[in-house]
């Protein structure tokens, strides 16, 4: 009877109504941006630079360089958010090694983390999907949903 209370309220602002990319293209752009996040010059031209969440955070009239900085910060934040849930800390470690500090082959990074390469690849895929979901919630104007996806630490009184 009161189930309408649990439905999300749509934003009145038209800026949130239509994402600049459909979900599949958004996911492809996130995967590409994650691969390039440690090399900002390679983020030039990434479709996420025109995504609503980047434009809102960068502000009106932001340069491409400013939008790149915002995108990098959001990718780094999403990776950090993974570590807030104990069951995803392995995903965070893998994402950090693959995307933020890619200094050697994935095989070597898996070895350094003490996990089989197949597990490393599986964790990397899961982390990438989670990060995509987190950013998608921001893109469609559901920042509260992004916080629910990340389940941030809560203080205990």
Segments the model singles out, each with a brief description of its role:
Residues 1-86, 106-107, 114-119, 123-126, ...:
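N-terminal interaction/assembly modules
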Residues 83-105:
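Short amphipathic alpha helix immediately N-terminal
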């Amino acid at each position: 009877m009161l189930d309408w209370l649990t439905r999300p309220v749509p934003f009145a602002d038209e800026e949130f109504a239509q994402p600049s990319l459909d979900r599949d293209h958004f996911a492809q752009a996130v995967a590409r941006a994650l691969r390039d996040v440690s090399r900002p010059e390679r983020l030039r031209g990434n479709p996420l630079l025109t995504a609503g969440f980047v434009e809102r955070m960068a502000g009106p009239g932001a340069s491409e360089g400013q939008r790149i900085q915002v995108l990098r910060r959001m990718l780094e934040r999403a990776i950090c958010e993974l570590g807030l849930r104990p069951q995803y800390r392995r995903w965070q470690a893998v994402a950090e090694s693959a995307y933020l500090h890619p200094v050697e082959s994935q095989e070597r990074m898996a070895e350094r983390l003490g996990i089989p390469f197949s597990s490393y690849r599986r964790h990397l895929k899961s982390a990438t999907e989670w990060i995509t979901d987190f950013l998608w919630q921001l893109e469609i104007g559901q920042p509260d949903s992004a916080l629910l996806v990340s389940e941030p630490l809560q203080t205990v009184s």
